[in-house]
Amino acid sequence: VSISDSDYQGRFTIPTPKGVYQAAGDTNINTDYAYLAQNIRTERGLLASSYGTSRAFPALGAQIETLARFYRRTRPDDADVYVAAAGGAIYTYTMGTEGWVKRSEGYKSDVWSSVTYETTEGGATVDILILSNAKDGMIAVYGSDLRVEKKALTIGDAYAEVKFATLGRHAERIWGTGAEGYPDSIFYSRPYDPFNWTNVAETPELGGGVINQPTWDGDKFIALEPFGGYLLAVKEQTIFEIRGTDPSSFTITEAYGTDGPVEERSICTDRTSMLYLSQNGIGLYDGNTLRLLSRDALYETMRMRMEGMDGAARACVCNHIYYLAMCIKESESDVLSENNTVLEYDTERGTFMVRKGMRVKDFFSVGGTVYFTQADEPFEVLRYGDPESGGYLGAPMECLWETPWLDLGKAYMKRDFVLRFTADADENDVPVEMTIKTERREKTRVVLLQRQRKDYRVKIQVSGVRMKLKIRSHAKAAGWRIYGGVQAEYSLDEV
């Protein structure tokens, strides 16, 4: 039966795809949102497959647990240098060279906190990367020759053996916390002197020191995050703000309770917001109030969290997107031992996307790029979201966008759907499945997208009072893009 366009009485569109929204059930929510989606990009009006992954560096024969990059302020033309901790050693990799070079070894931990800074060496300014952990104390990698030096901190007799788990930078000083035996203490160095932490009695503003903030509840400081013009100091149950420019004006104030213990490796800041994972979901602190983002918007997804596995959660923030790797069950009976899902939260647009198919062990946001290690291949550092890649190391990824149920007027039966959209792909003949599902049955048409951008018109003959649209691809490791949304037209019969 041929259908002429004049016979269509109804239409709906997905005008500007946004993300996953599960706060209002699965029926008649705004069609800009998917009730279920995975591995989809929606920025700037696109509905597209997510970028894939690629190998970022030569493999290192040990499990990388820290990755950082030199900030080349003094020698901006030099090749990028990356620093990794693995197997009790520190390695460097200079972009464009053969591989990793071991610079020092014999460390007890591979999980280091780091800050970039500079120091003087023979009258010249040198970039340094300062690293610390609670077992090994502080070391520094020098940008001039990539040597590693152990640093014995000058803190004063009372704190001779302090080793910081976490470092921060604020008011031209290095800050440290998480030292064993000092759960309530935050230390700060002298200005521009990162290895001297003693006070100066005559001129306190030029000295280092310590701020003590007991909460008498067994809690301890786990993170220091620069935030606007001040520093956030985070305990598992409480967020504190440190303000001021020197010791005479430093103040620490309790800002907010965190709504249950915060997962240490999930804390990230992005210009105007701090994000973290707690028992009740993803929290956002904007300097004034605390909001739970995921409790509603990702209700179904977070309901399937694997209990007892939040400690494996890892996060980073890059270009205003918060990436959080977690264990999310597919079915109630699943037992997971490693992260299988990444939740992406766009802090500017306020939208969520779910990523599947990667088993993230650790995340690293370095120099505007997201890197990660996989649970099954921790020796490799992979690039996350590589625009040149349409799959996972060349293997296809499954992309899905599923609208909520739409009744489009309960009094009518809908039939004979026509979908219209404009699309292209990274290769020719990339199959994308277009499915209309009604309460009666579902029907799928496979559309082969081409490199050349084209307009498509897809007829699907199926009927029902309620319907949903599913867009899915899984056959080729090639990216695809739909521009300007999808329009669906259909005929109506009174029920």
Predicted stretch roles:
Residues 117-154:
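Hydrophobic or amphipathic alpha-helical targeting/insertion segments
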Residues 78-81, 127, 225-228:
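Membrane-entry segments of alpha-helical transmembrane domains in multi-pass membrane proteins
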Residues 67, 138-139, 148-151, 165, ...:
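Generic beta-strand hydrophobic packing signal
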Residues 84, 114, 131, 140-141, ...:
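Short beta-strand element of the conserved SAM-dependent methyltransferase core
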Residues 126-130, 135-136, 161, 166, ...:
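A short, charged
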Residues 1-101, 105-124, 258-273, 279-280, ...:
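Beta-sheet repeat architectures centered on beta-propellers
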Residues 53-67, 104-112, 148-313, 350-356:
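Beta-propeller and closely related beta-pinwheel folds
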Residues 87-97, 139-143, 181-204, 241, ...:
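Short beta-strand segments and strand-loop junctions that repeat across beta-rich extracellular domains
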